[in-house]
From Swiss-Prot:
<keyword id="KW-0030">Aminoacyl-tRNA synthetase</keyword>
<dbReference type="InterPro" id="IPR012340">
    <property type="entry name" value="NA-bd_OB-fold"/>
</dbReference>
<dbReference type="GO" id="GO:0004816">
    <property type="term" value="F:asparagine-tRNA ligase activity"/>
</dbReference>
<keyword id="KW-0648">Protein biosynthesis</keyword>
<comment type="similarity">
    <text>Belongs to the class-II aminoacyl-tRNA synthetase family.</text>
</comment>
<dbReference type="InterPro" id="IPR004364">
    <property type="entry name" value="Aa-tRNA-synt_II"/>
</dbReference>
<dbReference type="GO" id="GO:0003676">
    <property type="term" value="F:nucleic acid binding"/>
</dbReference>
<dbReference type="InterPro" id="IPR045864">
    <property type="entry name" value="aa-tRNA-synth_II/BPL/LPL"/>
</dbReference>
<dbReference type="Pfam" id="PF01336">
    <property type="entry name" value="tRNA_anti-codon"/>
</dbReference>
<dbReference type="InterPro" id="IPR004522">
    <property type="entry name" value="Asn-tRNA-ligase"/>
</dbReference>
<dbReference type="InterPro" id="IPR006195">
    <property type="entry name" value="aa-tRNA-synth_II"/>
</dbReference>
<dbReference type="InterPro" id="IPR002312">
    <property type="entry name" value="Asp/Asn-tRNA-synth_IIb"/>
</dbReference>
<protein>
    <recommendedName>
        <fullName>Asparagine--tRNA ligase</fullName>
        <ecNumber>6.1.1.22</ecNumber>
    </recommendedName>
</protein>
<dbReference type="Pfam" id="PF00152">
    <property type="entry name" value="tRNA-synt_2"/>
</dbReference>
<dbReference type="InterPro" id="IPR004365">
    <property type="entry name" value="NA-bd_OB_tRNA"/>
</dbReference>
<comment type="subunit">
    <text>Homodimer.</text>
</comment>
<dbReference type="GO" id="GO:0005524">
    <property type="term" value="F:ATP binding"/>
</dbReference>
Length: 457
């Protein structure tokens, strides 16, 4: 029977003594007279599996069994009490599936993460990145499972959009026009009416606005997909292409929004601790000492702390720390501020609510003081901002006034304003940066290491 290495470790008693077949890649190989010890891994589990091959002609087979070679192994599962991992396969037959040679860049030694970033197509074959992307898979499924269980409908929002939903202006523009030919014309002009859509279009920075439209029909929805920002920031926290999870809920206020965000985060952490225990223990030992306890602490937190933006500014201003970015009311929080609050002051996750309306998006609901909005940011240790959201402005007149104040062209958003014209209601939502969640789950500190094929500045 053909089984995975993960199944062998999980159901060893069942397979013990039985003839089994495993496929995988050689991670290491040792030769002793007429005996070969092969460390095989098929990607399903952190640990390699030992294959013992006896009575073989080493001269014929030695050059074939190179690191990276793929094999099919048939043999009997047995115990070896002398080994720490006391399971092994006594091979009867080994079939070469795909050869490798000495130029294979991943050898049985420690490679730096910076080197492995130069070979993203191969780095997942290492123990480190195998663990990372198994955790990524678990977290992805756990998010879908959480919202399905809570009665949310999964929706798909467009990748191509004419709108800058965040108002940030950092967009990748798309065109089907021959720009090389147009650039040679005198004068050089581009008529977007001749373009595919007859106007300027961009890669999306958020699916939120469309998700709001769906929520005001289906009650509770979420979208989960790639987003794009042409932000020229070469930092460990920024990528040009990344994944965003964005739930939107009708008849939901800011307080309920906070509750959903906390429950979601805790459930994802629980699922990863259960399904990827070995991977997380390995990362705890090799990447970040204390990672396992940090994750458990988040799960055990009964209710995340909630403070106002004003309180956060007061704490930072009175801290005595000489921050590189000056702290004052009306300033956005920099990474150093977020980390001080979560790692030094509170030493745990914290929601910051009631932000000055001048530094938040036009769609966020004004508070009664008319100076702040019902916005929330969830800050967590090491990562900083993980979630950003708000109660949305449901009042048509107020929303139009805010758009005018921010010089946002109303014509392009008439469809969005229709949501307030016809059956408007309170509604809320948030955005979760999936890769930032993975930084927290894995203990890594560079977003390039939690995306299989990163696209960065």
């Amino acid at each position: 029977m053909e089984i995975s290495i993960k199944n062998i470790f999980e159901k060893a008693d069942f397979y013990l003594g039985k003839k089994i077949i495993v496929n995988g890649w050689i991670r290491n190989c040792r030769f002793q007279k007429k005996l070969i010890f092969i460390e095989l891994n098929d990607g399903t589990f952190l640990e390699n599996f030992q294959i013992v091959y006896k009575n073989v002609d080493l001269e014929k087979i030695k050059d074939i069994l190179q690191i990276g070679t793929s094999l099919k192994v048939e043999g009997f599962l047995k115990k070896n009490e002398k080994q720490e991992k006391n399971l092994e396969i006594l091979a009867q037959n080994i079939t070469l599936l795909g050869s490798s040679d000495f130029s294979y860049p991943i050898q049985p030694k420690k490679h730096s993460k910076s080197f492995l970033r130069t070979i993203p197509h191969l780095r997942t074959r290492t123990k480190l990145f195998g663990a990372v992307f198994r955790i990524r898979s678990t977290a992805f499924f756990a998010l879908h499972h959480f919202f399905h269980k809570k009665g949310f409908f999964h929706i798909n929002t467009p990748i191509i959009t004419p709108n800058d939903g965040e108002g940030a202006g950092e967009l990748f523009q798309l065109t089907s026009l021959n720009l090389e030919r147009l650039s040679q014309e005198k004068p050089s002009t581009i008529n977007y009416q001749k373009d595919f859509f007859g106007k300027k279009v961009f890669l999306t920075v958020t699916g939120q606005l469309e998700a709001e439209a769906m929520a005001l029909a289906l009650n509770k929805v979420y979208t989960f997909g790639p987003t794009f920002r042409a932000e020229k920031s070469n930092t460990p926290r920024h990528a040009a292409e990344f994944w965003m999870l964005e739930p939107e809920m009708a008849f939901c206020d800011l307080k309920q929004n906070l509750k959903v965000a906390q429950e979601m985060l805790q459930e994802v952490v629980v699922q990863c601790l259960q399904e990827n225990q070995k991977d997380i223990e390995f990362l705890d030992q090799t990447v970040r000492n204390g990672l396992l306890q940090e994750l458990k602490n988040v799960v055990q937190e009964k209710e995340f702390l909630v403070i106002t933006y004003q309180k956060a500014i007061e704490i930072l201003a009175s801290s005595g720390v000489a921050f590189e970015n000056k702290v004052f009311y009306g300033s956005d929080l920099a990474t150093e501020h977020e980390k001080f609050l979560t790692e030094k002051h509170f030493q745990k996750p914290v929601f910051i609510i009631d932000w000055p309306k001048e530094i938040k998006a036009f769609y966020m609901k004004n508070n009664p003081d008319q100076k702040t909005v019902a916005a929330m940011d969830l800050l967590i240790p090491r990562v900083g901002e993980l979630i950003g959201g708000s109660q949305r402005e449901e009042n048509l007149a107020v929303l139009i006034e805010k758009m005018q104040q921010m010089k946002i062209p109303q014509k392009e958003f008439e469809w969005y304003l229709d949501l307030r014209r016809f059956g408007s209601c309170i509604h809320s939502g948030f955005g979760l940066g999936f890769e930032r969640l993975l930084l927290f789950l894995t203990g890594l500190d560079n977003i390039r290491d939690v995306i299989a094929f990163p696209r960065t500045y």
